[in-house]
Amino acid sequence: MKILFYRYNSICEPDVIQAFKELGHSVCEIREEMTNKAVTPSECVHLVSNALEKTNSNIVFSINFYPAISEVCNIYHLPYVCWIVDSPVMELYTKSITNPWNRVFLFDNTLYQEFAPLNPDCIYYLPLATNVKAKQQVIKQAKKSGYVMPDVSNPDSIKKLCQYKSDIAFIGSLYTEKNPYDSLRNTSDFFNGYMDGLIEAQLKVYGYYFVQEALTENIIEEFKQCMPDFYTQPQGSYITDRATIAQYYIGNKIAAVERQRMLSLLSEKYDVDLYTGSDTSSLPHIHNRGFAKTLTEMPIIFHEAKINLNMTAKPIRTGIPQRIWDVFGSEGFLISNYQSEIPEYFVPGEDIVLYDSPETLMEQTDYYLHHENERKEIAHNAFEKTLEYHTYEKRVELILSLIQTSP
């Protein structure tokens, strides 16, 4: 099969491309958006149309959903296959989601339940995956040499393996720099009290995101009036103002509050290494290690940490985020917040440790920092299960089998 792959530099792209190739398929890449984030929908249409004329591809593939690509494939009568790996992806709410040549795979079952009725024969549920082989190769090389080269093109970037050891490691944004909620202006006292209470209530609940249901019409109207440049979709979009506020604005705000609180709490008692580009001035006890290279450093960080921490952003309502799969593929030990889909694939206490409150997280952290054998056994269990069932090769095989048998 010939696959035209539209890229924008998602961390998932190289692994999916490798899986396609290892299964014997050829891949032609459109790379313009990897370096030019100002590509317009019309330019996207032009890029894809030109590539289709030249490559004679059987399908077009992308990570996340591009309405422009969907429209092109609808004209060409060619399957447009995309795998949604983030949330929210606002483009899903456009009218293009109903096109009959779409084959959309959603990693979050709640998202699937939301969108499947709009295009029942063309939307699927598919969890994320990881590239176990690549991660183990990086770890094996580092252990053999005792060194890590984050930038393979720069020999001066070399570091000792021991520099990656951590008691507790967290890789990710604090969401403070991508939190549009804080742009609200001139809100009423009632609004402020309502929103503060709603955010605090949601912070106490794991496994169910109720913010969208709790927004009143008056709160929605005041939010729109007090938010400069309120996000609006094109005419005919399926998203409501309620969903936009709950997922795009409040979800990111809750993620920012939760991550800062949890990391502050942990770092006051334990050594916590944070790999991030976010401002950590509000976390004086954190060890800010800067950005981590996805391919060359993250697997080693996950493997060498005594405890890896996952805090799923609230817009991911029930699904398993990419971070969990990548920790497991690196044979790392993980403590994560509870997500309702996790027990469908992994056994709590055997493959993963789940917390449902700050108090539980502190107790689990203290226990597992002092029980190395249990950590290693749990990490190995998750690794073996991931290797057998949750690699990109397995997922890509399933994608291709489903699109070949679909109407």
Predicted feature locations:
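Short acidic active-site motifs
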Residues: L47, I69, L92-Y93, T296-E297, ...
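N-terminal beta-loop-helix "entrance" segment that forms/cooperates
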Residues: T35-L52
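Histidine-centered beta-alpha loop that forms part of the nucleotide-sugar donor binding/catalytic region
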Residues: N64, I84-S87, F107-N109, P127-T130, ...
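Catalytic binding pocket for nucleotide-activated donors in carbohydrate/polymer assembly enzymes
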Residues: L4-R7, I11-P14, Q18-L23, C28-T35, ...
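Glycosyltransferases and closely related glycan-assembly transferases
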Residues: L52-N58, A68-Y80
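Active-site proximal beta-strand in glycosyltransferases
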Residues: C73-P88, R103-L106, L128, A169
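Nucleotide-sugar donor-binding catalytic core of glycosyltransferases
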Residues: K2-C12, V16, L118-C122, P127-I316, ...
